[in-house]
A protein has these predicted regions:
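Sec-dependent signal peptide recognition
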Residues: 2-10
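C-terminal motif of bacterial Sec signal peptides marking the signal peptidase cleavage site
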Residues: 15-19
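N-terminal helix-rich structural modules
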Residues: 26-250
Length: 255
């Protein structure tokens, strides 16, 4: 029997859904959805309505800032996660065909799994999801939707399909098998076209250059290790003016 994982959705129960005594109504739909080994539930936050306005505003801005980091997490987990998610979301929002078929239900379930796991790999096993719908079905659904709905995603259609349906491509988000090159065999986007030996040597050289520092920093945090056009290893740092700058700018603004 599969282990049941639970998404706790922090839904604030508005006064209209509570009785005068402050308790939730018995018919409140606490279970929002369930698919595979996931159950989505909501719960009440006692006392939220009694908070001062300033504290409610603080919670709002913190939650908005967190949402701005969502696409960053998707991209960090695998380089194709965002194109896959956005393509499927466009289909989900615009498809006018029969939504009662088994293949549509399978596509919908796959998208929900991508939403929950922040990508195409299982949040616990790190294995890539196996679609229960066919590539032909997805392409047929895409063809029924005007191209302008997909925008720049049109040029990535082949890459998206390969990422979903080719079991040899991005098979695991995180490989920890002894003897394997853990970077080249993992699908996470923290390292791009860089081997484990190259990464270890890069950071060893960086640490050696800073050997006299009585308070050395940790290396390799908040960055992607990749190669420039000349093949030299370099870091793309997540910061204002660096990698993910538009999202980080918005986070800074909200905070």
């Amino acid at each position: 029997m599969k282990k049941l994982f639970t998404i706790v959705s922090m839904t604030l129960i508005i006064p209209a859904l509570t009785s005068c005594g402050g308790g939730p109504k018995g018919d409140m739909p606490w279970i929002v959805d369930r698919f595979d080994d996931i159950k989505v539930i909501r719960y009440e936050v006692p006392g939220f309505d009694a908070l001062p306005l300033e504290e409610k505003e603080l919670i709002y801005y913190l939650s908005e800032a967190a949402k701005c980091g969502r696409d960053i997490l998707f991209d960090q987990n695998c380089p194709v996660n965002l194109p896959v998610r956005r393509t499927l979301e466009t289909v989900y929002e615009n498809y006018k065909g029969d939504r009662t078929t088994a293949e549509w239900k399978a596509l919908e379930k796959y998208l929900k799994k991508v939403w929950f796991a922040n990508g195409i790999h299982h949040h616990y096993s790190n294995d890539k999801f196996v679609p229960e719908f066919t590539e032909g079905y997805l392409l047929d659904a895409i063809e029924t939707i005007p191209e302008e709905k997909f925008g720049s995603l049109n040029s990535l259609r082949g890459e998206v399909c390969r990422a979903i349906f080719d079991p040899a491509l991005y098979p695991t988000k995180l490989n920890q098998k002894a003897g394997d090159d853990l970077l080249l065999t993992s699908s996470s986007n923290y390292y791009h076209n860089v081997s484990q030996a190259e990464a270890e040597a890069f950071y060893a050289d960086m640490a050696a250059a800073d050997a006299g520092n009585p308070e050395p920093v940790s290396y390799g945090l908040n960055s992607q290790l990749t190669k420039d056009d000349a093949g030299r290893i370099c870091e793309r740092v997540w910061k204002l003016g660096g990698m993910y700058s538009p999202a980080i700018e918005r986070i800074v603004y909200l905070l």
